[in-house]
């Protein structure tokens, strides 16, 4: 066990789980109800990372450019609600854990690290997704988009973890795939691992200057 780090926080989408197919399906199902065009999966990928309201706002902005159709504030709320409904029904139809995630988490837990999830995903979806892959029991805390007043890139979730478990920021390692993860971690005073395979708006994660850059989740074991 690395004696510097006591707690390891993980982003969810694009870090632990490849959830893009189910997210894209849910976005397009919601858009279809309002006669809006279907977005290709590779485009939806660039909208992920700031929570459901921002995801839908980006989708509607794209749809507006395609069709010229402007939705009312009420309709925007309805699209978001329909997305949440469809995603709730399709959390793990096609989503999969990335390679080596479960095995690595089990090793880290066995080594004595406190493990936590910090995601901007709607809070009500976090535990069900983790449970579907049989890894929810490995985490001592699961923070979603509605768990606290602020979400990433604000450092509040990491401050919360430090306070709850009694650790200094230097004792916390955060692992994510997007610039929001890197910004949040560094703002909190934590070291950060950037993973290259996730959803960083098609921008190389290295450009966000994480402390380590890994291509495979199992590479975490090289520093822990």
UniProtKB/Swiss-Prot annotation:
Gene Ontology CC terms, in alphabetical order? cytosol
Cofactors, names only: Mg(2+)
Q: Which residues form the active site?
A: 11 (nucleophile)
Q: Does the keyword S-adenosyl-L-methionine apply?
A: no
Molecular-function GO terms, alphabetical: metal ion binding; phosphoglycolate phosphatase activity
The reply on keyword Magnesium is: yes
Q: Which UniProt keywords apply?
A: Carbohydrate metabolism, Hydrolase, Magnesium, Metal-binding
Q: In which pathway does it act?
A: Organic acid metabolism; glycolate biosynthesis; glycolate from 2-phosphoglycolate: step 1/1
EC number(s) per entry: 3.1.3.18
- First-tier enzyme category under EC: hydrolase
Give the binding site residues for Mg(2+).
11, 13, 177
One Pfam short name: HAD_2
Q: Which family does it belong to?
A: Belongs to the HAD-like hydrolase superfamily. CbbY/CbbZ/Gph/YieH family.
HAMAP family, sorted: GPH_hydrolase_bact
Summary of the function given for this chain in its UniProt record: Specifically catalyzes the dephosphorylation of 2-phosphoglycolate. Is involved in the dissimilation of the intracellular 2-phosphoglycolate formed during the DNA repair of 3'-phosphoglycolate ends, a major class of DNA lesions induced by oxidative stress.
Q: What is this protein called?
A: Phosphoglycolate phosphatase
| Species, as recorded | Haemophilus influenzae (strain ATCC 51907 / DSM 11121 / KW20 / Rd)
């Amino acid at each position: 066990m690395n004696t510097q780090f006591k707690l390891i926080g993980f982003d969810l989408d694009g870090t632990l789980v490849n959830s893009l197919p189910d997210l894209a399906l849910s976005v397009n199902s919601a858009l279809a109800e309002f006669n809006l065009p279907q977005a290709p999966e590779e485009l939806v990928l660039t909208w992920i990372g700031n929570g459901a309201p921002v995801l839908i706002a980006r989708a509607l902005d794209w749809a507006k450019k395609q069709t010229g159709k402007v939705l009312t504030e009420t309709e925007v709320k309805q699209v978001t609600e329909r997305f949440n409904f469809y995603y709730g029904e399709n959390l793990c139809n096609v989503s999969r854990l990335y390679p080596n995630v479960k095995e690595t988490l089990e090793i880290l837990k066995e080594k004595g690290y406190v493990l936590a999830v910090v995601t901007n995903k709607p809070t009500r979806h976090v535990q069900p997704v983790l449970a579907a892959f049989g890894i929810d029991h490995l985490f001592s805390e699961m923070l979603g988009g509605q768990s606290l007043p602020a979400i990433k890139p604000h450092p509040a979730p990491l401050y919360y973890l430090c306070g709850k478990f009694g650790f200094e920021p230097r004792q916390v390692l955060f692992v994510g795939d997007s610039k929001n993860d890197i910004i949040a971690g560094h703002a909190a005073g934590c070291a950060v691992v950037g993973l290259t395979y996730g959803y960083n708006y098609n921008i190389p994660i290295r450009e966000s200057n994480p402390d380590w850059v890994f291509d495979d989740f199992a590479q975490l074991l090289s520093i822990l």
